[in-house]
């Protein structure tokens, strides 16, 4: 059977190597067949090092973060009210063309005995997004992490993203946006909590505060409020709200 021979992939390195990544970037630039005055210009002199740093420190640094550790140390609670953070900006890299995507994530869960700070949800999204990942897999990874590592009774993640795979190549549709949703546990079924989260997402996407982030704690949709998705210490959260108890958010 005819066809070109594909060289086997090298085994993955045990640890990231900035020098190896920089060398590979330099070889990639050589392989592009750029005009000599471009390839030898001062603009590209330090590009391999900068590219290696950008990838290892900003684009695929999520592989060094453990979702289980991020969600560890939750506060015990007997409550089952919806907890949500909307408008979480994130970026990821498409594994097909190694082009970035940039989007907004909305995350919610129904506690199964523990709650975590809003900031931990933001860090969870970053840890799972800063990888080579498709949007639909990212949404599922976030929801699954909340169920498996936090013990949430239900979890959901809704994403909207601009993918350069669609906007600068291929179909080249600059206004196209990718949407992905994942629902797990009790939120996989229609009910008050799921509908409340959908309302929060719709409000975030339609309102002037889009992308700024809003935290919500709601019992049957009776209470919600915009706030920064930063993580406050338990004592600070209790003082801020003026109420005691481990479930104060």
Outline where the language-model segments fall.
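A domain-level signal for the structural core that forms small-molecule/cofactor-binding pockets
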Residues: 2-213, 217, 223, 227-249
């Amino acid at each position: 059977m005819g066809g070109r021979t594909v060289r086997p992939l090298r085994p993955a390195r045990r640890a990231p190597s900035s020098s190896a990544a920089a060398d590979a970037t330099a070889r990639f630039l050589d392989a592009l067949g750029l005009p000599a005055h471009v390839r030898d210009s001062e603009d590209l002199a330090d590009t391999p090092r900068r590219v290696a740093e950008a990838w290892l420190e900003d684009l695929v640094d999520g592989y060094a973060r453990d979702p289980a550790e991020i969600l560890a140390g939750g506060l015990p609670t007997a409550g089952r009210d919806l907890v949500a953070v909307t408008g979480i900006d994130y970026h990821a890299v498409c594994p097909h063309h190694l082009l970035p995507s940039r989007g907004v994530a909305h995350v919610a869960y129904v506690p199964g005995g523990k709650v975590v700070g809003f900031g931990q949800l933001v860090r969870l999204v970053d840890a799972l997004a800063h990888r080579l990942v498709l949007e639909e897999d990212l949404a599922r990874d976030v929801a699954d992490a909340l169920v498996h590592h936090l013990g949430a009774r239900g979890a959901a993640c809704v994403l909207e993203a601009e993918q350069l795979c669609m906007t600068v190549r291929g179909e080249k549709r600059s206004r196209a946006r990718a949407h992905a949703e994942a629902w797990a546990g009790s939120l996989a079924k229609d009910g008050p909590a799921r509908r409340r989260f959908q309302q929060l997402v719709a409000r975030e996407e339609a309102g002037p505060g889009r992308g700024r982030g809003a935290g919500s704690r709601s019992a049957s949709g009776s209470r919600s409020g915009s706030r920064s998705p930063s993580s406050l210490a338990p004592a600070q959260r209790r003082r801020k709200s003026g109420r005691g108890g481990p479930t104060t958010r």
